[in-house]
Amino acid sequence: MSKNIYCVFLRKQAEGQDFQSYPGELGKHIFNNISKEAWAKWQQKQTMLINENKLNLISNTDRNFLEKEMIKFLFKS
């Protein structure tokens, strides 16, 4: 069962994620502050970015780009 959290993306109480979806300290921050709904919105945006920019997720440069976009999308909207 998921807990309710205050989602900083949605700016309201919402259902939290069931598990940490991203590794490390950033992943913990996302788990504690980003709801399931907001994470799903990010996944849609992420797919769009990967396809439009033809990102290669094996490339560190492309993964770093995607991580920066994720932070911008989730925490600076």
UniProtKB/Swiss-Prot annotation:
Any Pfam family the entry gives: Iron_traffic
InterPro entries documented for this protein: Fe_traffick_prot_YggX, Fe_traffick_prot_YggX_sf
BP GO terms, sorted: cellular response to oxidative stress
Transmembrane segments: none
Gene Ontology, cellular component aspect: cytosol
Signal sequence residues: none
Keywords carried by this UniProt record: Iron
Single GO molecular function: iron ion binding
Annotated family: Belongs to the Fe(2+)-trafficking protein family.
Function noted in UniProt: Could be a mediator in iron transactions between iron acquisition and iron-requiring processes, such as synthesis and/or repair of Fe-S clusters in biosynthetic enzymes.
NCBIfam families assigned to the protein according to its UniProt record, in alphabetical order: PRK05408.1
Protein's recorded name: Probable Fe(2+)-trafficking protein
Organism of provenance: Baumannia cicadellinicola subsp. Homalodisca coagulata
Taxon lineage: Bacteria, Pseudomonadati, Pseudomonadota, Gammaproteobacteria, Candidatus Palibaumannia
